[in-house]
A protein has these predicted regions:
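Active-site "substrate specificity/gating" loop of NAD(P)-dependent dehydrogenases
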Residues: 5-12, 34
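A glycine/serine/threonine-rich, flexible loop-to-helix segment
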Residues: 35, 47-69, 79
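Conserved SDR Rossmann-fold cofactor-binding beta-strand/turn motif
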Residues: 39-45, 49, 88, 101-103
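C-terminal substrate-recognition "lid" of short-chain dehydrogenase/reductases
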Residues: 73-102
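Catalytic tyrosine of NAD(P)H-dependent dehydrogenase/reductases that use a Tyr as the general acid/base
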Residues: 15, 23
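Active-site helix of classical SDR
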Residues: 18
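Residue(s) in the substrate-gating loop at a strand-loop-helix junction
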Residues: 1
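Alpha-helical segment proximal to the catalytic Tyr-Lys
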Residues: 31-35, 93
Length: 106
């Protein structure tokens, strides 16, 4: 999540820290196992319109928060999935130890 880079709101510091750990693991492990032909990458989503917002009681939260996104809209789960599909493809065969940010420029 972009919280790893941007930080979390006061009550979400633990969430941001866990996301930062994923970034560190991705980069470090990617370097460690590259000579074995293993690629390690991650996707760092920004504000994404998913059902988690409705489950937390604010179904429009992604759209409400989109004002801080340069593209002025939340992302979609499919946009994140497309990044994952690219990372899994032969087109990304030289990509490892990388965290792809899917955040509309934020």
């Amino acid at each position: 999540s972009a919280a790893a880079v941007l930080g979390g709101a006061g009550m979400y510091v633990d969430y941001a820290a866990s996301k930062g750990a994923i970034d560190a693991l991705t980069i470090g492990l990617g370097r460690e196992v590259a000579t074995d032909g293993i690629r390690v990458n991650a996707v760092r989503p920004g504000i994404i319109d998913t059902e988690i917002h409705a489950a937390s009681g604010d179904p429009n939260r992604a759209f409400s928060a989109a004002g801080v996104v340069p593209m002025q809209r939340p992302g979609t789960a499919m946009e994140c999935a497309n990044a994952v599909a690219w990372l899994l493809s032969d087109e990304a065969s030289y990509v490892t130890g990388t965290v792809v940010t899917v955040s509309g420029g934020r």
